[in-house]
């Protein structure tokens, strides 16, 4: 009986974890839409003017705006070539 309860508990945790992960992915897509400067029709500058005070340019690509201490991006940022 204890083994069955333990197994069911692990199963419930696995399902809950998957649900949380899906919600996190949806949140990242929405945040990326708000965080990038694509809608402002401005090119990314070194100072990232299009993002205001919360932005930085990444690898010469789009301007990604900071949200707290994190860079919100749908894709993992590639390392910059020097």
Curated annotation (Swiss-Prot):
Give the main location: secreted
Keyword presence, Signal: yes
The pro-peptide lies at 18-34
Q: Which cysteines are joined by disulfide bonds?
A: 37-51, 44-57, 48-80, 50-65, 59-63
Q: Which residues form the signal peptide?
A: 1-17
Q: InterPro entries recorded for this chain?
A: CNTX (IPR035285)
Cite a GO CC annotation: extracellular region
Q: Which GO terms describe its molecular function?
A: sodium channel regulator activity; toxin activity
Pfam families for this protein? D_CNTX
Give the UniProt keywords, A-Z: Disulfide bond, Ion channel impairing toxin, Knottin, Neurotoxin, Secreted, Signal, Toxin, Voltage-gated sodium channel impairing toxin
**Which tissues does it occur in?**
Expressed by the venom gland.
As for subcellular location, the record says: Secreted
Function according to Swiss-Prot or TrEMBL: Reversible inhibitor of voltage-gated sodium channels (Nav). Delays the fast inactivation kinetics of neuronal-type sodium channels. In vivo, it induces rat penile erection. This effect may be due to the neuronal nitric oxide synthase (NOS1), since one of its selective inhibitor completely abolishes all the toxic effects of the toxin. This toxin also causes scratching, lacrimation, hypersalivation, sweating and agitation followed by spastic paralysis of the anterior and posterior extremities and death at dose levels of 0.24 mg/mouse.
Written domain comment of the UniProt record: The presence of a 'disulfide through disulfide knot' structurally defines this protein as a knottin.
Protein family according to the UniProt entry: Belongs to the neurotoxin 03 (Tx2) family. 06 subfamily.
Name assigned to this protein: Delta-ctenitoxin-Pn2c
């Amino acid at each position: 009986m204890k083994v069955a309860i333990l197994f069911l508990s692990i199963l419930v945790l696995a399902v809950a974890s998957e649900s949380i992960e899906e919600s996190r992915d949806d949140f990242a897509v929405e945040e990326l839409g708000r965080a990038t400067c694509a809608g402002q029709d401005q090119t990314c500058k070194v100072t990232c003017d299009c993002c205001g005070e919360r932005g930085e340019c990444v690898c010469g690509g789009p301007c990604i705006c900071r949200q707290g201490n994190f860079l919100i991006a749908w894709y993992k940022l590639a390392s910059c070539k020097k």
